[in-house]
Amino acid sequence: MPVIALDRDRIRSIKVEYNLTEHCNYGCDQCSHLSPYMAKRESSLESFKRDLAALSEVIRFYRFRFVGGEPLLNRELLAHITAVRASGIAEEIQVCTNGALLDRTPEEVFAAIDTLTISWYPDPHCDQAKIDRAIEICRRVGTKVGVLKIDKFRRMQVARPIEDKSLVKDIYDTCEIAHTWYCQTFYEGRFYLCSRPLFTGPYLSKIGIEAPDFRALDGIPLHEPRLKERLAEALRSKKPLAACRYCLGTVGRNEPWRQLPAAERKAPPRPASSLAEMLDRRRLRFRKLLPLPPLRSLLLFAPQGAIGRAAAMFSTSLKRD
């Protein structure tokens, strides 16, 4: 479970992320948000503001992270950033991008955020010139920037539910996405420990498999009484999500990065690999032996006014994710 701190009025956590789009201009195989298979959809600014207002009453984060899909595809990106800044819900705002649209991004977007993270894949749509331009603008406006070269993804999605309950629990307990990287999110009135409940159902439906409504099963309603207590309980829960039965967390085997062809995105085949072939047992054993909270969790126990200064100690880690 992610490390959190409780004040009298609010929960304190490290990070929350928000999917500005479900679709993407890339089609990465093994995308953790299953973006190649999602319909074109941008965040509703009205729904976002409503959920943001509810959350800001009960929780504070060090960082608010915009993801996707590809967040630079959202035409109201700047309005979303402005809403987060006005809410006071986080000390820093981050945008994570594949970099392909950096040359079209207005300078005011770079200036409005605190950190830009570029996931640089071996694809010609993002080149050194685009990255150099982004770095130069970020330096000029005082925004931190991190460039991560990525040439492999881990297997995550399985087509059939994992029946071994102890294995599901082990995968959940060792999941860095939920517990170490603080990839909590919210969407249309519900809060989630990670994004898998949002996207697993639509993917399974696309390959012809009927699945439960993970969005309802795994989401915490944001507009009902006792939100602070219910959020704290969910964040401290040791029980796997319903969607965890269809996920390998961060212990799937690595696969070389590749772009899926359009035909495969439109009509994806069911995965042919067995669970044994997809699961990295060695990594699972290692993660079980090393269930340590991330160093950035120490930020939660710094005095409120010192959090920003203390965060500089962990800037490399925070730029990474």
Where do the model's predicted regions map?
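Short, intrinsically disordered, charge-biased short linear motifs at domain edges
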Residues: 12-17, 158-164, 225-236
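Cys/His-rich zinc-coordinating "finger/knuckle" motifs
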Residues: 31, 35-39, 182, 201, ...
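Disulfide-bonded cysteines in secreted/extracellular proteins and peptides
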Residues: 24, 28-31, 175, 183, ...
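C-terminal accessory region of radical SAM enzymes
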Residues: 140-155, 196-254
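Short cysteine/histidine-rich zinc-coordinating motifs and their immediately flanking basic loops
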Residues: 40-44, 254-263
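N-terminal pre-core extensions flanking Radical SAM catalytic domains
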Residues: 1-36, 218-223, 236-240, 250-251, ...
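Conserved alpha-helical substructure of the radical SAM core
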Residues: 1-95, 101-104, 267, 274-279
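Conserved AdoMet/S-adenosylmethionine-binding subsite of the radical SAM
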Residues: 74-197, 202
